[in-house]
Amino acid sequence: GIHLGRPDTGSPITVARGTGSHLNAAGTPWGLRLLNGLARAPGAAGAAIRSLFTPGLEKILTGAEPPILTTEMAAGGGVCTANGLATLYTPLACDGMIAGRRYLSGAAMQAIRRIERYRPDGGLFFYLPPLWHLGYHTFPTRGGWSAFGHIGLGGSFGLADPRSGLSIGFVHNRLALESIGWDMATPAWLLPLILSGLRASGRISREQAPDIAA
């Protein structure tokens, strides 16, 4: 299942309670001083802080019912299972098709696969060129250069790799200021392992990919 925000009452999908310290430290006097100092820093670190943090951000992420779940912010308040997220990306990996049914036209797939922007990103991507597609970015990691998708707050992500016909969903419920850098970098070490392992097995075809996507 996949929901844009809190699932409706009666839905079989429920919100997993978040773990970690969330971003509570960002709202303390010490945390505010630290973030304000980092925001003024030159280079990639300062750019990332300015792009992500604003005073009061931590308030919408805390509690048993985080207010962010009342927004329609997919990269921050999406609620889904790994299988649901992988299924969402399956048409992007399989020429617009799922189980023989077309969801995206050939023209739409060509447009989505086309890279629209090659310039380095001066914000969250630490001046690396994320190579933006239509709403998706590449994952510039070993073995994943043909893949694209989107990463969300905390490090959950969805990905499609048209070359192998593989879609991947990775979700978790940890959000902690002390580990957010590592968690957001998860694709950098996880994707090479997944893609290299599946391709090396020699047992994965485009027809099989949707079944093992999650």
What are the functions of these language-model segments?
Residues 1-214:
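Catalytic loop of the DD-peptidase/beta-lactamase superfamily, centered on the K-T-G motif
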